[in-house]
């Protein structure tokens, strides 16, 4: 039973909730038991998606137990009669189940390019030990993760990336929400007065973003920085996902915009990239091991 691990940015929690809750073939879902995964766990429970919360150090043993049980189910019908071995083996191979292991990393990583690189690399190496493939739910993130394919080419399992329809890795989570780099560039050109894009998760966590900005080397809060740079608007991206409590986007974005005297632009988002890349990683369609594209 192959293992697909997902290392995810907390800002893509809603997109991850969608693909995991809609995957009717997924029977074994494990979440790394940490504080940053609690939001995803709550949303999955609300969607009646069963899953296990397991301490990181215990996950390899739990995977072995699941694989052992699966092997027993596979062998039992084969031992009933030699004449059915070929048919049964083929049937079981085509219906082979996956184990999906999800590790949500802390949002504060966004404040420092070196920090995000170090943490993601560490977790990819760590989880590769028990994985047959790793789906990285991060964009390039200011190119902090641009060389990960080459840097970790010694791994024993492939890394799958979030890519747009041109097969290029997406810049960041906003490019993911807009449907790709091309649409992102078009939006930036079409709305030059927009200084920040709010997805539901960014909206829900904007006060924490402000706190991060204040604690970093920046002397200004996010809103004050937008004001000083002359931006007059912020964008609210509606991806159609309403897993975030209250979908606080309208009230949260309105709260932020009012505080800094900014207008709100409403834009249509998309879940296409995460939907497609999750399915492709699960099916192993990308045979380009460790692609750095």
What are these regions (language model features)?
Residues 2-110:
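N-terminal glycine-rich anion-binding loop in soluble enzyme alpha/beta folds
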Residues 103-106, 145-208:
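Long, charge-dense
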Residues 118-130:
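Short, well-structured alpha-helical segments in soluble
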Residues 20-26, 151-154, 250-257:
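Short, solvent-exposed amphipathic alpha-helical segments in soluble enzyme
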Residues 2-6, 99-100, 133-135, 158-159, ...:
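Hydrophobic beta-strand segments of well-ordered beta-sheets in folded domains
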Residues 222-293:
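Extended, basic/helix-rich recognition subdomains
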Residues 184-252:
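A conserved mid-domain beta-alpha-beta active-site/ligand-binding segment of alpha/beta enzyme cores
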Residues 6-14, 109-114, 134-147, 166-168, ...:
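Gly/Ser/Thr-rich loops at beta-strand to alpha-helix junctions
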């Amino acid at each position: 039973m192959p293992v697909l691990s997902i290392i995810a940015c907390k800002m893509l929690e809603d997109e991850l909730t969608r693909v995991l809750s809609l995957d009717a073939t997924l029977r074994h879902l494990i979440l790394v038991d940490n504080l940053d995964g609690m939001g995803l766990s709550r949303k999955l429970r609300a969607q009646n998606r069963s899953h296990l919360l397991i301490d990181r150090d215990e996950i390899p043993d739990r995977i072995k137990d699941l694989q052992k049980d699966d092997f027993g189910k596979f062998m039992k019908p084969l031992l009933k009669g030699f004449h059915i071995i070929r048919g049964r083996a083929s049937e079981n191979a085509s219906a082979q189940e996956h184990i999906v292991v999800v590790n949500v990393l802390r949002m504060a990583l966004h404040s420092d390019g070196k920090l995000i690189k170090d943490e993601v690399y560490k977790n990819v190496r760590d989880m590769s030990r028990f994985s047959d493939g790793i789906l990285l739910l991060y964009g390039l993130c200011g190119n902090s993760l641009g060389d990960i394919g080459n840097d970790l080419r010694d791994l024993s399992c492939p890394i799958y990336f979030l890519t747009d329809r041109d097969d290029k890795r997406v810049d960041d989570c906003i490019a993911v929400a807009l449907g790709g780099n091309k649409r992102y560039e078009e939006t930036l050109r079409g709305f030059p007065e927009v200084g920040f894009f709010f997805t539901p998760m960014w909206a829900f966590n904007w006060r924490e973003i402000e706190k991060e900005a204040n604690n970093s080397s920046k002397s200004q809060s996010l809103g004050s920085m937008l004001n000083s740079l002359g931006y007059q608007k912020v964008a609210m991206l509606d991806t159609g996902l309403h897993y975030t409590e209250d979908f606080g986007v309208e009230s949260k974005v309105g709260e932020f915009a009012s505080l800094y005297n900014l207008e709100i632009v409403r834009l249509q988002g998309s879940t296409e990239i995460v939907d497609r890349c999750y399915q492709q990683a699960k099916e192993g369609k990308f045979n380009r091991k460790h692609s750095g594209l």
